[in-house]
A protein has these predicted regions:
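An alpha-beta-alpha
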Residues: 63, 82, 172-216, 221-223, ...
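Short, solvent-exposed amphipathic alpha-helices that sit
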Residues: 74-91, 168-172, 199-218, 236, ...
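Flexible loop/hinge segments that line or gate small-molecule binding clefts
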Residues: 129-167, 178, 281-289, 293-294
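Hydrophobic alpha-helical segments within soluble ligand-binding/sensing domains
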Residues: 160-187, 233-234, 280-284, 299-317
């Protein structure tokens, strides 16, 4: 992607008009700012929308939520948003986690259990794109299916709450490109892609590379894939640091970056690489406050969970809804940590994974 293409991308993404979604009930709740996409289930075109949350449901609908895992605070915060919103609306919520992106069969069994419950709607944070899509197309069920965070095929999808992971990476790339414009001192980056999803596709990595177009970042070293397990990520980090002592930046997920903070402290390098996380967590919040991390993206995980519950209940209640939405992606630095962003992104410190809500 050349410089003109990058500029076009920014105008296309961010020079947008605002639309208002009006619901037929009054509420004192704060409106949510989202990106509403048309055509549906594509990330290329969106408009900013204001959604006023519904405040109650006409009956205790049964909602079943499936997560890839709750190994880090990203999905924990999504879980909190769902749990809190379900409690506010007086609906039932049953949740389950697959235990990692390699557990396709386990998630498929959990989906079948949702149908056997029986759920009125399924909110699916998938472990795989292609493999699960092919199975879902063969599924004989009229239960509405809503995608959450991770992408799903539009076929058979009633609604979706999520953001473009390509754009999460692109924002990292542009952040680095602005620090190192073409013609300035070259920079070297190590990129840790995290878990290898079954479709073996890294939208984040593609976004980073496109965002770095026409910059002085001359080398991007890609580390190996690895599950969001601290021991796995630590081994990958140590291996790469042993091989490359001249890094300017380390970019990865929140788990990797948290480990890197301690690893770099232990190594006492003369010029340690600076750290960037393409997504957010409680650890990233603390690290930004202390100046240990340069930048982290938040796609507002708590709001993800709230929107998913709100969207499903709207559909079941026959109320107006936007079928394909997502929170705004916000790039956070030490001087951009507002209480509202924290509230919309991170679960309370005392919150534990919750798998059942009864009205």
């Amino acid at each position: 992607m050349n410089r003109s293409a990058c500029h076009w991308w920014h105008r296309y993404r961010f020079g947008l008009v605002t639309i208002i979604l009006t619901v037929m009930m009054t509420s004192t709740a704060q409106a949510w700012t989202v990106q509403s996409r048309q055509p549906l289930f594509q990330f290329e075109q969106w408009q900013q929308a204001q959604i006023e949350p519904i405040t109650t449901a006409s009956r205790p609908w049964r909602l079943c939520a499936l997560y890839p895992h709750i190994k880090d605070s990203y999905w924990l915060s999504v879980n909190y948003g769902m749990v809190d919103q379900a409690e506010r609306l007086g609906v039932q919520l049953k949740a389950a986690e697959a235990g990692g992106y390699h557990h396709l069969e386990r998630q498929w069994q959990q989906l079948q259990a949702c149908l056997d419950w029986p759920a009125d709607a399924i909110l699916l944070g998938t472990v795989a794109y292609q493999e699960l899509n092919s199975r879902l197309q063969q599924l004989d069920s009229e239960v509405p299916l809503f995608g959450v965070v991770n992408d799903l095929s539009r076929d058979g999808l009633t609604g979706r709450v999520g953001v473009s992971w390509y754009q999460m990476g692109f924002k990292v790339g542009r952040f680095l490109a602005e620090r190192h414009p073409a013609g300035s001192v070259p920079a070297k980056v190590a990129w840790f892609p995290g878990p290898k999803r079954l479709e073996a596709k890294s939208e984040v990595g593609s976004g980073i590379r496109d965002g770095l177009a026409d910059s002085a970042v001359t080398e991007v070293i890609t580390a190996g894939y690895g599950d969001n397990d601290r021991d796995v990520q630590r081994a990958l980090l140590q291996q790469l640091l042993d091989q490359h002592q001249d890094l300017d930046y380390i970019v990865g997920g929140a788990v990797l970056v948290e480990i890197a903070i301690n690893e770099l402290k232990h190594r006492q390098l003369d010029k340690p690489p600076q750290l960037i996380s393409h997504y957010y967590s409680h650890g990233m919040y603390r690290a930004l406050l202390r100046g240990k991390v340069l930048m982290a993206n938040t796609d507002q995980m708590v709001l993800h969970g709230r929107l998913a519950i709100d969207q499903a209940v709207r559909y079941l209640e026959g109320q107006p809804l936007e079928h394909d939405i997502g929170p705004e992606i916000i790039s956070l630095t030490r001087d951009r940590l507002s209480p509202q962003i924290k509230q919309d992104s991170l679960s309370p410190a005392s919150f534990m994974p919750t798998y059942r809500v009864e009205p």
